[in-house]
Curated annotation (Swiss-Prot):
This is 6,7-dimethyl-8-ribityllumazine synthase. The lineage of its organism: Archaea, Thermoproteota, Thermoprotei, Desulfurococcales, Desulfurococcaceae. Keywords: Riboflavin biosynthesis, Transferase. CDD domains: Lumazine_synthase_archaeal. One of its GO terms (biological process) is riboflavin biosynthetic process. It comes from Staphylothermus marinus (strain ATCC 43588 / DSM 3639 / JCM 9404 / F1). Signal peptide: none annotated.
Amino acid sequence: MARIGIVVSEFNYDITYLMLQKAISHARFLGLEITYVFKVPGTYEIPFAVANLLKRNDVDGVVALGAVIKGATKHDELVASQTARKLMDLMIQYGKPVGLGIIGPGATRMQALERVEDYARRAVEAVAKMINRSKSLEEKKFAGETVFIE
């Protein structure tokens, strides 16, 4: 059974709490074991928590959940883009998948609420698929014909 951690932002917690509940439910449906739920103050802090979980032996992948709501400035764009960039870097650094379940930038509160289930579910599914496909790749060997990992 694959083991995952979930990192969830407490900022806009009315939205991210719902995302967390959907993510937990979907992870269990897919047969994933949730070893840790790590709450952070905001989306900006998500990469720190993800890095701490990815270095653990009892975590095969991490789901990152947050909601970056559009404000009067471009702060939402900065936070969302830098967080996503760092999460990609951490995946490569640790060789473990990270599911991006961060709503925004540019989303209104209403749009974020409409996207809760979709973003949470897709982030969990991405991690589950990548964990399984990475394990599948380790078990395969090229023997003259193309090997499909799916």
